[in-house]
Curated annotation (Swiss-Prot):
Necessary for normal cell division and for the maintenance of normal septation. The keyword Magnesium applies. This is Probable GTP-binding protein EngB. The gene is engB. GO terms for molecular function: GTP binding; metal ion binding. InterPro entries: G_ENGB_dom, GTP-bd, GTP-bd_ribosome_bio_YsxC, P-loop_NTPase. Mg(2+) binds at residues 39, 61. GO terms for cellular component: cytosol. HAMAP family: GTPase_EngB (MF_00321). GTP binds at residues 32-39, 59-63, 77-80, 144-147, 178-180. Keywords: Cell cycle, Cell division, GTP-binding, Magnesium, Metal-binding, Nucleotide-binding, Septation. Its cofactor is Mg(2+).
Length: 203
C-alpha cells in the first residue's frame, strides 16, 4: 500500500512570511541542524530522489520550502540551522522568520526534528522542540543515520535521548530511529505524518 506522501510536489520557496501559502490548510514542518540529513529524510519519505535538494554544503536551505501532498496539505522544509558560515544578519533574519512561523502559523499540525543519531539534542534541537511544546503541537524527534551505529548503540542512544527529552518535556515528544539507507523507521514516520495531515492510504 503506497503512502500519499509519495505524491509530493514542489510548490514554492518563501523568504518572508508574506510569501507563505494561505493559512487554511494542514502542514508538517521538518527542522534540523545542517547536515542532520533532513533532505534525505524528505526524499526517502516521498520516494523521490530529488524532491529536496541534498547538498554537500551545510546550510544550503535558505528559505521555507513547501511541497504539496494533496490540495491544502503540505510538507515544509525549514532552513537548516546551526551552521557557522551563514552570515550573522541572515541568522537573525531566519530566527525572526521561524519565530513568527511557529507562533502564528495556524496550519501547522506537527513538527519533525531531524537529528544525527551520533550527535543528538544540541541546543537548537531543544529550541525547536520547545516551540512545538509551547504551541501544544505534536513533535517527533527523529534520530537519523541509524545505520551508522550497531543495534546495541542505537538502543543505548535512543534510551539516553528519551530520558533527556522526558526531563525537558515530560512525555510530550515522540522519538524514533531512522535510516534513509536501510529504510529503517520509514513506515513508522509515514504513519505519524499521515495521521497529522489527516491522510488516508490508497489500496
Amino acid at each position: 500500500m503506497s503512502s500519499p506522501l509519495e505524491c509530493a510536489k514542489y510548490l514554492l520557496s518563501a523568504h518572508t512570511p508574506h510569501q507563505l501559502p494561505s493559512d487554511d490548510g494542514s502542514e508538517v514542518a521538518f527542522a534540523g541542524r545542517s547536515n542532520a540529513g533532513k533532505s534525505s529524510v524528505l526524499n526517502t519519505l516521498t520516494r523521490q530522489n530529488a524532491l529536496a535538494r541534498v547538498s554537500k554544503t551545510p546550510g544550503r536551505t535558505q528559505q521555507l520550502v513547501y511541497f504539496t501532498v494533496t490540495p491544502q496539505r503540505y510538507l515544509v522544509d525549514l532552513p537548516g540551522y546551526g551552521y557557522a558560515k551563514v552570515p550573522k544578519e541572515l541568522q537573525i533574519h531566519w530566527q525572526a522568520f521561524i519565530d513568527t512561523y511557529f507562533h502564528h502559523r495556524q496550519s501547522l499540525r506537527g513538527l519533525v526534528v531531524v537529528m544525527d543519531i551520533r550527535h543528538p539534542l544540541k541546543e537548537y534541537d531543544l529550541q525547536m522542540l520547545a516551540y512545538a511544546r509551547q504551541r501544544g503541537l505534536p513533535a517527533q524527534a527523529l534520530l537519523t543515520k541509524a545505520d551508522k551505529l550497531g543495534r546495541g548503540q542505537q538502543a543505548q542512544t535512543l534510551q539516553k535521548v528519551r530520558n533527556e527529552l522526558t526531563k525537558h518535556f515530560a512525555d510530550h515528544i515522540n522519538i524514533q530511529t531512522f535510516s534513509s539507507k536501510s529504510r529503517q523507521g520509514v513506515e513508522q514516520l509515514h504513519t505519524v505524518i499521515e495521521t497529522w495531515l489527516g491522510l488516508a492510504r490508497s489500496g
